[in-house]
Amino acid sequence: MPEVLDTYDYLIVGAGPAGCLLANRLSADPANRVLLLEAGGPDNYPWIHIPVGYLYCIGNPRTDWCFDTDEVPGLKGRSLKYPRGKVLGGCSSINGMIYMRGQARDYDQWVAEGNPGWSWRELLPLFRRMEDHFAGTSEMHGAGGEWRVERQRLSWKLLDAFQQAAAQTGIASVEDFNGGDNEGCGYFQVNQRGGVRWNASKGFLRGIAQRANLTVLTHAEVQRVLLEDGRARALSVRWQGRERRFEARREIVLSAGAIGSPCLLQRSGIGPQDLLERLGAGVVHELPGVGGNLQDHLQLRMIYKVDGVPTLNQIAGSLWGKLGMGLRYLASRSGPLSMAPSQLGAFARSDPQQPSANLEYHVQPLSLDRFGEPLHTFPAFTASVCDLRPHSRGTVRIRSLDPGEAPSIQPNYLSDPRDLTVAADAIRLTRRIAAAPALAAFRPQEYKPGPEYRSEEDLQRAAAEIGTTIFHPAGTCRMGQGSQAVVDAQLRVHGIPGLRIADASIMPSLTSGNTCSPVLVIAEKAAQMILAERRREAAPQVLESAMAAGGKEAVEA
């Protein structure tokens, strides 16, 4: 039997963006004892905080789970590296730092699918509450919150020209992607403070380290959720080399992400019956949708060689260039070392019939064959484009009951023919932008996938050959009703009192953009609902105490 260490009001699994925010909000009431558990270590690795350091965090077991997908039929049988944050701050410690809420229609669609309370109008105040926006308070933005948003600290002549070329192609320039309709082209706003990464640990934990009612444990790997009489009561946790048990008086909240949360449920005997029986887990509670509905944004990284303009390829390729970058960052926290992985963004429609922008571009003044490999020696830029609303759906399944064994991750990219059509249209649109007059002075030449891909069939084949994840998995514990839903609109796991999920896994459908800030608003909403429920339950007790006190006074009088 695991050793029982302690009992808390709330147990939170995973100190990624959602877990950090939840720990902050739930522990704001001193009456709540809160335990936050993180499988990774503290966020004290220097490369986490230097923005360009994501290159040294992705694929590094110190900060990354280092997952791989199964072989994906739609990608010519390729398996992809599938990074997920394993460190305090989670993916906010290794991601691209892009601040992106998505589109209003994303959240309104969740409501239309039977999830009241999740509309854009209802979530906007929560986005604003957490924000510390460089522009200050406005109708759309907040100031003084924990989640710092800044302008980037450099621009590139080549990217300015791409923005002009996009305008010449019909994609208007915009200053802010976060007003509910992100269509247009402009520089991304980023989660940085003074040229340093601003992760969820800094934003939501460091300022409250003195709270006596909050405990944060790192290197604590949660093995299983333990039920008693059908209710989630405790967690079995591997910590300091031993299996321990932590108990919850009120609730357990899973914030382990779109991969971690369904795997934890499955190891706990909660999930599809056939999987649980095959692995000998025992069916504690059948929920067929656990681990299904996996969605992700597939990026097509198109590369163009250029002439007559500096790119990071040349700057980082010389000793003097590296020295200059380092000195500039030390002196002013600016220059290439302060760069988010992608600086310029664009949201566009793959065809005029789309109701809103369904493509996102991440444009970079650099190129490489794949993450972890050196930059090319020739000057080039990358125009990465992804389908924001993929129809393909995948799965996440544990391979065994051993928490140390990586799961089966099958994204099933491009398995739906509609996604192949959008991919081909996206390549054609990118070529039109590259051929616009604003870029002509730099003589862009398509290097990847290559001009030889021309027909519809060619372009779909190119997408299968160059497509890769842009690290936005979601949907594996979807919110809603019906047989495939895992949580209700209150984020309560169907059929299991005392257990909620608050992370990207609950999204019924992907948001139209980067997913970190949408995950934060999910956690903000979850905290609001949890605390409201606590107040409702406490109200009768307060009334009873008041009446008892009043009755005593009446007798004494």
PLM region spans:
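Residue-level detector of alpha-helix initiation sites
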Residues: 12, 16-21, 153, 258-259, ...
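N-terminal glycine-rich phosphate/pyrophosphate-binding loop and immediately adjacent elements
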Residues: 2-128, 287, 297-306
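Conserved redox-cofactor binding core of oxidoreductases
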Residues: 111-232, 238, 301-323
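FAD-dependent oxidoreductase catalytic-site/capping-region signature
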Residues: 2-8, 124, 130-179, 186-188, ...
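Glycine-rich loop(s) and the adjacent beta-strand/alpha-helix scaffold that form part
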Residues: 33, 40-43, 225-228, 234-324
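Classical protein tyrosine phosphatase
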Residues: 20-54, 119-122, 260-286, 420-423, ...
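Short loop/edge segments at beta-strand edges and connector loops
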Residues: 218-220, 285-287, 481
